[in-house]
Amino acid sequence: MLPSWTPGGHIDVQLPSGRRRQYSLCGPPGRRIDYRIAVRRIADGGGGSIEMHDAFDVGDSLVFEGPRNAFYLGAGERDVRFVIGGIGVTPILPMLHAAQQRAINWRAVYAGSSREYMPLLDEVVSVAPDRVTVWADDEHGRFATADDLLVDAGPATAVYVCGPTPMLESVRIARDEYANAPLHYERFSPPPVVDGVPFELELARSRRVLTVPANRSALDAMLDDDPTTAYSCRQG
């Protein structure tokens, strides 16, 4: 049996190159016979997703650590809104099953450019079709606004959001007026550097010094210098 896990949890996969990447568990909650993860291949990303797709085949073994969970479904929350964007569906799908099993009053909005590019869409809808709203930009002729994503979410509604940074930030700003309402989110990419200042970074082993511009991170500068630099989640 694999280690137990809870909805929102993830594992840290060690790739053959030495890279480490975090992937949310998106199978049935608590399943321990096997784990399911979803990996979107990103051509212009950091290389981890391409390596996952190219290095492994059916029957291969993965080396991983975990599971861990910093994005879990609160035990005492009874009125919940889930906001989903793109591959952000992976940690939230098991939460939907758990919320349904706990008889929580929940609703979900799944937004994306088109239904074709919304991973696991059928599985999300099948949890409870009357509780899930699908927003496809190509059907509406525009992106979903925070008002669209949070319709009927009241001042006491707990909100869980996982998706692209613009979606996450719009929801976060919209919920600022409800300071006491729980807001839970998980980022799959780092937030942009805002109001930064340039600085110099000394690499301890090589004693080399890199200049980091005001609008970039230390890791960005290291990757510019050596694209094979190993890193993990980029969340700091």
Language model region names:
Residues S17-R19, S206-R208, P227:
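Short acidic/polar mixed-charge low-complexity motifs
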Residues I37-V39, V80-I84, M222:
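Well-ordered beta-strand segments characteristic of repetitive beta-sheet solenoids
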Residues P3-S4, M52, L73-G74, Y231-C233:
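Short histidine-centered beta-strand/loop micro-motifs
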Residues L15, L25, V39, L73, ...:
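Hydrophobic residues in beta-strands and at strand termini
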Residues T211, R216-G236:
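Immediate flanking context of iron-sulfur cluster ligation sites
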Residues M1-E65, G112-S114:
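Ferredoxin-reductase
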Residues S49-R207, T211-A214:
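FNR/FR-type flavoprotein reductase catalytic core
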